[in-house]
Amino acid sequence: MTADNDTRDWTEKYRPVSLADIVGNDAAVKALRQWAETFGTGKKAVILYGGPGVGKTSAALALAHDMGWDYIELNASDVRTKDAINRIAGPAAMAGTFEGTGGRRLVILDEADNLHGNYDRGGEAAIINVIRNASQPVILIANDMYAMSKPLRESALQIQFRAILSTSVAKVLRKVCANEGLKCDPEALMKIAERTNDLRSAINDLQAAAQGSGQVTVADVSTGDRDVPETIFKVMGMIFRGKNMREALNATYGLDENPEDLIGWVDENLPREYQDDDLERGFEALSRADVYLGRTRRRQDYGMWRYAGFMMVCGVNRARRRHYGGFSRYSPPTYWQKLGRAKSTRVTRDSIAAKVGKACHCSKAEARSTYLPLLRFLFDKDEYAIRLSAQLKLEEDEIAFLLDAKKASKKVGEIYKKSRALIEEEIEEEIDLFARFGKRPGKPEAGEPRESLFMAGEEEEKPSREKSAKLDAFGEIEKPKRKRRKAPDGGAPIEDGPEEPGEAPMAAAMPAATESFGPAGAPAPQESPLPEPEKPPAAEDKCSKKQRTLFDF
């Protein structure tokens, strides 16, 4: 490949395509290839860890190329919240390829050791869940593996990528110069390789030196040295065992740690390095540093950080009077872990309280104070624990909190598994009920024999009048006609004939119109009409019509 019109960054332009192009980490490449070829028999995920620019991301992409796998990558520019991981990485790790050919899809998560900020809250737990349920290979890339939680480290195979030798870096730089048509001084290339700690930085420095010219000389690369960031472990060694306190103090300026964090590291590892009087003097200097930090917080005067840094570095360094041999493994402050565990416990407790409050129609505070102790008591019986876990849809960490047990314990796993099975059964019952909804019980399906709508032993009862009824031309019941005859006194004709079934004749039911209620031969007395009640005059109505309406109930 030549320069020509290709304006890409050289680190991307010369990124290795195959695993065979990865330099300086043959053992790591071999282990990575073996994991891919035997996928399905061991760990579902692998952690590639090491310093920046040693080929971790390039090895992951080259592996996908060599194995013929699709890949999806989440890097530092992506949002790594719990929801984002479950939405993107989760389906990608469980589904097939985009083409549906049945091949593998590689899920790559870069900077997996930086899932500790507020914006990535819940991301690490989501990654563990993705790995547990994955059917596709997953690669996690990290600079500091020990910044990741222990459950996450144990869920994956660990492969370390070491720093590349300067001779190997210079060899790659010579190939880049040849492809770009540059005249490069071998001494200049070696100088670039020695002053950088990684291949990516070396290629960037080479591109910067060759900008605007067709050659790279020693003068071009001697204009300045690259600032190399120090690691906290190296600085700890310089503080406790270094002979030059000025070098140790200058090394802290390259740390990505503030004095509030650095004093925690020194306080945690000081008893592992010093003994007796040296330990006493070291803690005395450390206490003076803490005084300055307290004044900084109270007065908001961050100029006092320099005094705190001087006491925690130079003061501790000069407290040593004798030499201590052996190897000491430095560790981060344990109170960070305690704070993390306490915070995780509070989050789990509040999550359970929110679910209980929703089910019991009460506030989260009331559920936390009233119902959580009752739940702990009920969870002593497995039957109640399973049913309550299914009803509240509790996760494993929530079940472990109520049982006061570890999340990885056998009992927690069994209760979680049985509760999920119970939830699935209820869902299936709801689906069956919904499928039967809307069907008429008396209407037979296609191909089924038609049955009566009435239960066995019941007979259809119809009104007796409908038994003898006839229908007219409009489909209505035709009433029987009555015969008309003349009255004996020449009055109005009288209807006679069949009555409705069950009806007595009209003449038998009512007295005759000419029947007398008085003595024989005397005419019936005439009743005088009752006088109608007089209406009150309008003047006496003291309430208006509107008022009468209001009080008229």
Swiss-Prot record:
**Coiled-coil region(s):** none
Keyword Repeat: yes or no? no
Pfam families per the record? AAA, RCF1-5-like_lid
The alphabetized UniProt keywords are: ATP-binding, DNA replication, Nucleotide-binding
Which InterPro entries is this protein grouped with?
AAA+_ATPase (IPR003593), ATPase_AAA_core (IPR003959), P-loop_NTPase (IPR027417), Rep_factor-C_lsu (IPR023935), RFC_lid (IPR047854)
* Protein task: Part of the RFC clamp loader complex which loads the PCNA sliding clamp onto DNA.
**How does the annotation summarize its subunit structure?**
Heteromultimer composed of small subunits (RfcS) and large subunits (RfcL).
Quote the protein name from its UniProt record. Replication factor C large subunit
This protein's species is Methanocella arvoryzae (strain DSM 22066 / NBRC 105507 / MRE50)
Taxonomic placement = Archaea, Methanobacteriati, Methanobacteriota, Stenosarchaea group, Methanomicrobia
Encoding gene (name)? rfcL
